[in-house]
Amino acid sequence: MNTFESIAARVSVRDFENRAIPRGDLEEIVSAALYAPVGMKRYDSLHITVLSTPEEVAKFTALARAQIGDPHADPVHGAGALIVVSGKRPDEHTEYANAACMIENMLLAATDLGLGSLYVQGAVRAMRGSAQEASFRALLNLPEEFTPIGSAAVGFAKQKAAPRTQPQNDVTGVDYIG
């Protein structure tokens, strides 16, 4: 698949099969994150944690359910893996942009490998300052200086989505000057 095909084919999947992702696929996906542009080349300000089995992902889901008070919530929709990007400077806009670039690369790599994906930020961010924060950090085995920013849920989609046509968006315009 070429870059534009991957971009068009990538959709947010919210219904995954409950099975593990092959380690080699996860390694390729993480490798794509490492090619992402990062402001001022501060790669050392970022950390990636891979919850690589459905059992580990289920632990995250349990923490998220406890945090939001909904025993049925599933912010990762049964994904087989969750790849969390953390930063040393979580309150800086650049750190969010860096994490977003890494996550987008991973979402596109997952698509290229025939896997489904979903950008998950809200449930990750909700853990900050919460009663579940210590348990979440322990699950991630996260060094103290890092704070989770966002994540990519990855898995086998129960249904394959057709590539999208170019979206028409009345809110955002494109102006070519000159």
Give the label of every model feature segment.
Residues 65-66, 133-150:
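Short, conserved aromatic-histidine micro-motifs
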Residues 40-43, 74-77, 140-146, 165-167:
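Solvent-exposed alpha-helices and their adjacent loops that cap or buttress functional pockets
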Residues 33, 91-136:
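Small-aliphatic-rich amphipathic alpha-helix that forms the alpha element of a beta-alpha
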Residues 66-104, 108:
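Helix-adjacent hinge/juxtasegments
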Residues 80-83, 116-118, 150:
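Structural motif
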Residues 1-81, 174-178:
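N-terminal amphipathic, basic helical "cap/leader" segment at the start of enzyme domains
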Residues 5-6, 12-13, 17-18, 142-178:
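C-terminal helix-cap and adjacent tail motif
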Residues 53-58, 89-91, 158:
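Short, charged/polar surface micro-motifs in flexible loops or helix N-caps
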